[in-house]
From Swiss-Prot:
Disulfide bonds: none annotated. Belongs to the SPAN-X family. Residues 10-35 have a biased composition (Basic and acidic residues). It comes from Homo sapiens. It comes from the Eukaryota. InterPro entries: SPAN-X_fam. Pfam families: SPAN-X. Signal peptide: none annotated. Residues 1-40 are annotated as: Disordered. This is Sperm protein associated with the nucleus on the X chromosome N5.
Amino acid sequence: MEKPTSSTNGEKRKSPCDSNSKNDEMQETPNRDLVLEPSLKKMKTSEYSTVLVLCYRKTKKIHSNQLENDQS
């Protein structure tokens, strides 16, 4: 059997890709959770949504008195 060299000390070395991907996953997950939590809490606290209905009339309403005056 081979003896472990002094550089490895008998431990398996991880490839840079494996260690980077694990570190990235660990770092990204808490950041995403922190960003999503406040928006979810806001949605839970609002029970009812507000609906606004606006009516806009382009022409003015003409009174019957004005019609009589215009015709004469």
